[in-house]
Amino acid sequence: GGMKSLFGRAFSGETLFLNKYTAIQPSMIALGSSFPGDILVYDVSQGDIIVQKSSYLASEETVKREISFSKKGTIGFFGGEGFIMNRYFGSGLLFIEIDGTAIEYDLNPGEEMVVNTGNLVAMSSSCHIDVVSVKGIKNKFLGGEGFFNTVVKGPGHVIVQTMPISTLAESLSGFMPQND
């Protein structure tokens, strides 16, 4: 959708250009993700969804996107995955790329869930997020989970992933040859 969409995609960390496929007769298209894991199909007409900027795979043309900022600037600075996410709305199917397996939760009003920042993939636009510091010096330096966690507050639907690519890369780094 034009220069405005192009700049929006660039600002949110997505690829600048999107491929458009149009069927001229009944047919199928195969989608593959860039990382081993699930591809989640979400019907946007069921409600707006906020998605991690790197998790967009594909969508129908009727799905609209806009940049979604956290209300707290510290989320972007300290949160790891960044505070810039994308809100998808309109109608049609959205295909979300998941690193590892997708696990879905429904939160009641006021119910909170604490997740590793890199594990949060998507949430209903009715959810609110905040980033909190991990308590305790031992937990911060020896826990292996980082300094911050994301708190998601309901009501709404939350999708987390089991193996963010950053976690896998960190796990494999010990097995890589070292240059001396």
Predicted region positions:
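Composition-driven recognition of glycine/serine/threonine/acidic- and proline-rich low-complexity segments
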Residues: G1-D180
